[in-house]
Regions:
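Short acidic/polar hinge/loop motifs at secondary-structure boundaries
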Residues: 185-213
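Short strand-turn segments of transmembrane beta-barrel domains in outer membranes
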Residues: 208, 215-217, 227-263, 274, ...
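Transmembrane beta-barrel wall of Gram-negative outer-membrane proteins
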Residues: 249-278, 283-319, 342-360, 479, ...
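Conserved C-terminal beta-signal and adjacent last beta-strands/turns
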Residues: 300, 312, 398, 555, ...
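Structural signature of Gram-negative outer-membrane beta-barrels, strongest in the C-terminal barrel
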Residues: 302, 421-428, 434-436, 468-612, ...
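Face-selective signature of the C-terminal outer-membrane beta-barrel domain
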Residues: 303-314, 345-512, 546, 605-608, ...
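Membrane-embedded beta-barrel scaffold of Gram-negative outer-membrane proteins
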Residues: 353-357, 363-379, 546, 552-558, ...
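Gram-negative outer-membrane beta-barrel transporters
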Residues: 410-416, 487, 499, 605-613, ...
């Protein structure tokens, strides 16, 4: 009896308790749970958990209110169980999200003016790599950047191991003129003295690539090219475990494997991936193996605070086929006359993010990062027209250790104006500081005389050529402000203050050689120590006017600066001589453009620009000598036109069509010349590695499951040095680079949501061409691009 009464009492109390509680679930428009939604009823509050569930004490009010910083406020009638879906908040400050949603089919677009702790105005682009078609495993840059005007591409390898891209007449060498970042932090070797990027994230791991130029790029650095930020896919939000595997086979013995796991468990989210690339290469002596690893763990402390820890690791070994002379290239571009050259890179990056949503208007972010990496080039570095007779090889070792932290604060505000006839002034203010410190050690000496990948000095304590340490420190303060006046006018300003201190300490050796017998008469060690600090203030401003809801005119101006690189001032290279008075570069960029959706099926992005490049560093024949000299050639002026247009023909006739047939044209014309120089014969000469006309176009057909694309790429001929030499030098370091065109074909079919196949042919017509003449590694000489190649990719996805 007592037991029965206890059960009745328990049931009664339970029912009474649950009758006093409102429960339910909150989801977005795609039925994904939303974490951190505030649920309110008079004085009682609750927050949704990671499954979107909530329990709220019942009150006497008739309505329950749901609020979240990223979603529209919603009030519903109070009931015992409430399940709701919230709409994403779209304000006038970030209304370009509307455009981006409409641009999903175009795989390209531009960034909202305000997002997170970032302001993006002027020329900028976002490449939606998740939706992009092409050879993702090998990272074909022609397909990746097909819709970004004005980019010149170096093709040093056919596997996407290193990226060489430059915009608006800037050098493509390892993308050194871009501030290269991943998830907002640095990935280059040394941000100050050696900003070359040996590491490129796998395209299969990316959600997008952000490119910001103009005044808004000052928040990231001083580079002429602006920012290029690789955005890794976020961990999946709606599953504790997801597994994706992509396996690719291709021509020249290529195999690529990409495996990723991801998930979220309550407040914890995670992802880990590994990528393998290996192959024999298009040319003889060009086999390679690369491993990449990435791990990310994120934890929500509460609905406003989030921590993320990331590790990136990469290792690759590549045999270097070396360069070719012009005669060799015409005979057989696949041949190699170097079989003892090797290249190795180890890359390790650790990063920590902290995000704090202070309020619906203000956000704070701190990102700290550190890197410990190394690169080794081993081989015979003599001129390519000299035979390798098997003597001791040269080894250049670079070790990079750096660390930094960047803090950003962004707040949105409204200025109430007294005059009723004048609309309020709305805006967003971003400010931040950055500290960076790094040390690069560069050593050059003799190594073994065999053909193995043996990265060891013969005399590590008495190097035959040079040994240097390059410490550097950098403090930066930056601010950006954007005003929205009325419904159409936007004005922004940016300022960056840089303090840079760089130094060098070490030695190099000079050899006295007998002019007839070539015997060594003496060796002289020269100790070299320098220290230089400088303050660099930079300014930028921009304006935009909305010609319609989905189109705008914009203009921008900003100052730029580039510090002398370590490799600019000290490397023993038999092919070039370094000017001892070489100095930093400076300049400015001005642009005017028009972009947007003219119609739902027609997107365009047009721009004209003027880039002034003062004290430009380049390669020229040495006066009264036979060598090439790296020096400040003079002042250059780059002016150009960039145009991109894409149209979906089927959508033009039927907006609700299930099929898509689109074509795009990407055209740029760049006129880059030296306008001042200490060498009179350089004035009026074209700037090296600037292709005056670049054209990329493509045709794509797409259904729900199937898509296919044909793409055409053309580059007009360009010079490789400031003297504009047409006839090649005997070592092929200097000479004209002829025009070339390439076609790429790809297709994709999705059998199910969990399985898809991709295939394609790169360089469909088997064109024989090259994009650069290398002065040293991986040459020297002509570096042929890959011929026709095939690939097949199978993707499988499992989701728990």
């Amino acid at each position: 009896m007592v037991r029965a009464l206890s059960i009745v009492f328990f049931v009664f109390v339970s029912n009474s308790f649950f009758s006093q509680v409102i429960k339910g679930r909150v989801m977005d428009e795609n039925r994904a749970p939303i974490y951190g939604v505030k649920v309110s009823c008079r004085h009682h509050n609750a927050f949704t958990d990671f499954n979107g569930d909530f329990h709220l004490k019942r009150c006497d009010e008739d309505s329950v209110v749901f609020t979240h910083i990223e979603y529209e406020r919603l009030a519903v009638k109070s009931e015992a169980e409430i399940n709701v879906r919230l709409k994403a908040k779209i304000t006038e400050l970030d209304e370009t999200k509307i455009i981006q949603k409409k641009l999903n089919n175009f795989e390209i677009g531009y960034l909202p003016p305000v997002r997170g702790v970032q302001i993006a105005t002027g020329t900028n682009a976002i490449i939606q790599t998740e939706n992009q078609q092409g050879a993702k495993s090998t990272g074909n840059p022609r397909e990746l950047f097909a819709k970004i005007p004005g980019l010149n591409i170096w093709e040093s390898d056919g596997a996407g191991i290193q990226m060489g891209v430059g915009g608006r007449g800037l050098s493509p060498n390892r993308a050194a003129n871009f501030n290269m970042r991943q998830n907002g932090y640095d990935i280059s070797a040394d941000a100050l003295g050696y900003p070359e990027s040996y590491y490129t994230p796998p395209l299969e791991a990316l959600s997008s690539i952000e490119i910001i130029r103009g005044s808004a790029s000052l928040q990231y650095g001083t580079q002429f090219g602006g920012l290029m930020n690789f955005v890794i896919k976020e961990p999946v939000k709606d599953s504790p475990f997801e597994f994706t595997t992509r396996n690719t086979v291709g021509s020249f013995g290529y195999f690529g494997g990409f495996n990723r796991i991801s998930g979220r468990i309550k407040r914890l989210e995670y992802q880990f991936y590994h990528q393998l690339k290996q192959g024999d290469g298009y040319r003889s002596n060009s086999a390679f193996t690369q491993h990449q690893f990435f791990g990310q763990i994120g934890y929500y402390l509460n609905e406003k605070n989030r921590l993320r820890l990331e590790y990136t690791g990469m290792h690759y070994d590549a045999r270097q086929a070396g360069g070719l002379t012009d005669v060799m290239f015409e005979q057989d571009p696949r041949q190699s006359v170097r079989n003892r050259n090797w290249f190795r890179v180890n890359w390790n990056i650790l990063a920590l993010h902290y995000d704090y949503d202070i309020s619906s208007r203000s956000t704070f972010n701190v990102r700290a990062f550190g890197m410990q990496s190394a690169r080794y080039s081993l081989g015979f570095l003599g001129k390519i027209n000299q035979a390798d007779i098997g003597l001791n090889r040269e080894l250049i070792a670079g070790n990079f250790e750096n660390a930094g932290a960047e803090a950003r604060f962004l707040t949105r505000y409204t200025v109430r104006l007294r005059k009723k006839t004048v609309s309020d002034l709305r805006g967003a203010f971003l400010t931040g500081v950055r500290y960076y410190q790094g040390t690069t050690r560069s050593e050059q000496g003799l190594a073994s005389n065999d053909s193995l990948a043996d990265y060891q000095f013969l005399n590590p304590r008495n190097l035959e050529y040079s040994s240097y340490d390059f410490p550097s420190r950098n403090f930066s303060y930056f601010l950006e402000n954007i005003w929205f006046k009325g419904e159409r006018l936007t004005f922004n300003t940016g300022f960056r203050f840089e303090y840079i201190h760089s130094s060098s300490q070490g030695f190099y050796k000079r050899y006295a050689i007998h002019p007839l017998s070539a015997d060594t008469l003496g060796v002289y060690q020269v100790t070299d120590t320098t220290s230089l600090g400088r303050i660099v203030p930079l300014f930028g401003a921009g304006i935009a006017f909305k010609t319609s809801k989905l189109t705008q005119l914009y203009g921008n101006f900003c100052l730029n600066y580039r510090a002398v690189n370590f490799n600019d001032i000290r490397v023993s290279n038999p092919n070039i001589v370094i000017d001892t008075l070489i100095r930093d570069e400076y300049g400015s960029t001005t642009e005017i453009g028009y972009r947007g959706l003219i119609k739902p099926y027609l997107y365009t992005d047009l721009a004209v620009f003027h880039l002034f490049y003062g004290d430009k560093i380049g390669l020229a024949p040495e006066p009264n000598g036979t060598n090439k000299i790296r020096t400040n050639i003079g002042d250059a002026r780059n002016v150009g036109v960039e145009a991109f247009v894409e149209m979906d023909f089927l959508k033009a006739f039927n907006d609700s069509s299930r099929f898509s047939l689109s074509a795009f044209v990407n055209f740029s014309y760049i006129h880059a010349v030296y306008i001042r120089s200490k060498e009179a014969n350089f004035i009026g000469k074209e700037v090296e590695y600037v292709s005056p006309v670049m054209l990329r176009s493509g045709l794509k057909f797409k259904t729900k499951r199937f898509s296919t694309q044909l793409q055409f790429s053309y580059n007009e001929g360009q010079f490789s040095d400031a003297s504009n030499a047409l006839e090649p030098s005997g070592d092929a370091v200097i000479g004209y680079i002829p025009s070339y065109y390439v076609m790429d074909f790809s297709l994709r079919y999705e059998f199910r949501k969990w399985f898809q196949a991709e295939a394609g042919i790169n360089n469909l017509l088997d064109a024989s061409y090259y994009t650069r003449r290398a002065t040293a590694y991986p040459g020297p000489g002509i570096l042929p691009s890959d011929g026709r190649s095939f690939y097949l990719t199978l993707q499988y996805k499992f989701k728990r």
